[in-house]
Amino acid sequence: QAERVKEYMNYYILNVMEEYDPEMDQLLFYLPLSGSAFKKVYYDQILKRCVAKFVSSEDCVINYAATDLEQAERITHVVKMSSNELRKLQVSGFYRDVPITSGSVSTSDDVIDKVNELDGVSASNEDDEHMILEMHVDADVPNFEDTSGVKLPYVVTIDQYSSTILSIRRNYEPNDPNFKKKQYFVHFKFLPGLGFYGFGLIHMLGGLSRTATSVLRQLIDA
């Protein structure tokens, strides 16, 4: 049975999950630069199958006190999608079918701007794009609180521009007495860091560069 499961999983990853190899290649290229990268494994409502997508550290925001994904009380995945993709998810019933006000959200960031410059792309207000915040949180949902007072795992999805709630879903098995949250993310680190995120070549070489500059200045002053 184990052999059959292994063969099926290999077949599924290599033949059905067409995005697996390209997404993994992108992750492995990005990882040494950033120090941290993520894979998100989930069931896609549009493709009607499991997918494994690369998520950059800029698009995966963890609460400050977290030491790992299992202990994090809030994981926010910043999802960029077109109006057509958003509409498909609304029609399928995955999101609430409510009017969404369109508009641009300021995402100015020195790192993101530099990456876009290297890629040769630039942001445009004319892009038909929505910024969706998918938050995996421990929360008290009104009328669904646990009698113990413990916050339970939910996935709350919000459109960033309009602040409209698109969905609130339970993130644990209905019959689980321990309310263990489902984990969709896998964290890859290039080198261990001082906190949640890992260190990349930019962190290491940046420090060496500053040290070399300091030593050179001291030699000149001497």
Describe the role of every protein-language-model region.
Residues 1-222:
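Extended alpha-helical, oligomerization-prone segments that build pores/tubes and scaffolds
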